[in-house]
Swiss-Prot record:
SUPFAM superfamilies according to UniProt: SIS domain (SSF53697)
GO annotation terms (biological process): gluconeogenesis; glucose 6-phosphate metabolic process; glycolytic process
Active site: residue positions: 277, 298, 414
GO CC annotation terms, alphabetical: cytosol
EC annotation from Swiss-Prot or TrEMBL: 5.3.1.9
The family this protein is said to belong to: Belongs to the GPI family.
Principal location class: cytoplasm
Protein name: Glucose-6-phosphate isomerase
Isomerase in keyword set: yes
Keywords on record: Cytoplasm, Gluconeogenesis, Glycolysis, Isomerase
Subcellular location: Cytoplasm
Any Pfam family: PGI
Bridged cysteine pairs (disulfide): none
Length: 427
């Protein structure tokens, strides 16, 4: 369901790949002997996910979505990006007659929080708060606001049926709070890190409330697990990992993930965290960036075409089948001179633009273009791409010889912030 096309890179992957190294890392991943191997729970999750908990989530989600118009999803980083990526990719940006998902806890902007509070005052809403520890600043202070808003509106007893916590199985501030107040809880597995957690209750529960077919998401992830089992370049995830690693070793500093579909913007944000937080350490790693074409061609297209070379390469997501399509209507006066497009659909025009841009950037601009060919934008495809990117990331990070599953650098800003806020115990 994902094919890696290297026709626009001038790279002979069979010549640049170290097949013995790929086999070695493949064994390291699946035998769980590499750095950070305690966090490889995602590897077999499409098979080993907790079926009993999943059925319980379905029951709770069905009950909740019959009571609310809006679900406030409170989390930051991996606690919300994957869910939002799935929601927008599958349902689109302007879905109707379904529970709306609104995301908070991902910012400390007072203006944004105030706007969400005002929006919810006349809405029936529930809360899904997601935090392993329950002490992360952004979701913690956000949950205080929206829990109070909900309890003040419906009372504590009613709120118990409208608040769900996704957290640690046994410990942590959020787990203790949920048990004390009687909120339903589901578990964040100990062996799956936040940026890998979208197929756990972290992402699956809010998506169930939104009405997305999560059974198909799991089917897609399982298909990817079965497809991506080989220890050579026939494995498309490894092919992608190897070519991006080769370009990094050639001196490229940035990879731009390009989509021609606006509803994939949050997918690119999820991808940026997955690769940036996993590889950006020990003074190594590509800077993951993203653009939406053709929109960003009108702002960054000039730089991409004629800016510095050997700095950035592009990875393009190409969608074979759009969720919907429509034709350009004819205008009798042809005032804009665009009647020549009336026999073409918007998707045909979009795909033609993609081809033209790839030619401009890769041939004229001498910028390598990797093309990831996706079949569609649905539930099954989402599950597939999650597993594809996570496995590709594991291979890519081990090729860099870094631990894909830790993030020690993020503690620096947290310490400085806590010190400035006079947090107890911080000196």
């Amino acid at each position: 369901m994902i094919k890696v096309n290297l026709d626009h890179t001038d790279i002979n992957i069979n010549k640049v790949a170290d097949l013995n190294k790929i086999k070695e890392i493949h064994q390291m991943i699946f035998n769980k002997t590499g750095k950070g191997n305690d966090f490889l729970g995602w590897l077999n999750w499409p098979v080993n996910f907790n079926k009993t908990e999943y059925e319980q989530m379905k029951l709770v989600a069905n009950d909740l979505k019959n009571q609310i118009e809006v679900l406030v999803v409170i989390g930051i980083g991996g606690s919300y990006l994957g869910c939002r990526a799935a929601d927008e990719m599958i349902r689109g940006l302007y879905h109707q007659n379904k529970v709306e998902l609104i995301y908070t806890g991902n910012t400390m902007s007072s203006t944004y929080i105030y706007q969400v509070v005002e929006y919810l005052k006349n809405k029936n809403f529930g809360i899904c708060v997601i935090s392993k520890s329950g002490t992360t600043t952004e979701p913690g202070i956000s949950f205080r606001v929206f829990e109070k808003l909900l309890v003040d509106k419906v009372g504590l007893e009613k709120a118990k049926s409208l608040i769900v916590a996704i957290t640690d199985k046994n410990k942590g501030a959020l787990k203790q709070l949920a048990e004390k107040k009687g909120y339903q809880t589901f578990v964040i597995p100990n062996d799956i890190g936040g940026r890998f957690s979208v197929l756990t209750p972290v992402g699956i529960f809010p998506l169930l409330v939104s009405g997305i077919n999560t059974d198909k998401i799991f089917q897609g992830a399982l298909k990817a697990k079965n497809d991506l089992i080989n220890d050579d370049l026939s494995n498309q995830a490894y092919k992608y990992a190897v070519v991006r690693n080769y370009l990094y070793n050639q001196g490229y500093k940035t990879e731009a993930l390009i989509s021609y579909e606006l509803q994939l913007q949050m997918l690119t944000e999820w991808w940026k965290q997955l690769f940036g937080e996993s590889e950006g350490k020990e003074n190594k790693g590509l800077l993951p960036s993203s653009m939406i074409f053709s929109t960003d061609l009108h702002s960054l297209g000039q730089w991409v075409q004629e800016g510095p070379r050997n700095v950035m390469f592009e990875t393009i997501i190409k969608i074979e089948k759009p969720n919907h399509d429509l034709n350009v209507p004819i205008d009798e006066d042809n005032y804009d001179g665009l009647n020549y497009l009336t026999k073409k659909s918007f998707h045909q025009i979009n795909q033609t633009a993609l081809k033209g841009v790839i030619q401009a950037h890769s041939v004229t601009g001498k910028m390598p273009n990797i093309v990831l060919e996706f079949e569609k934008m649905d539930d099954e495809q989402f599950g597939y791409l999650v597993y594809f990117f996570e496995l590709a990331l594991a291979m890519s990070a081990y090729l860099l010889d870094v631990n894909p599953f830790n993030q020690p650098g993020v503690e620096v800003y947290k310490y400085n912030m806590f010190k400035l806020l006079n947090k107890p115990g911080i000196k």
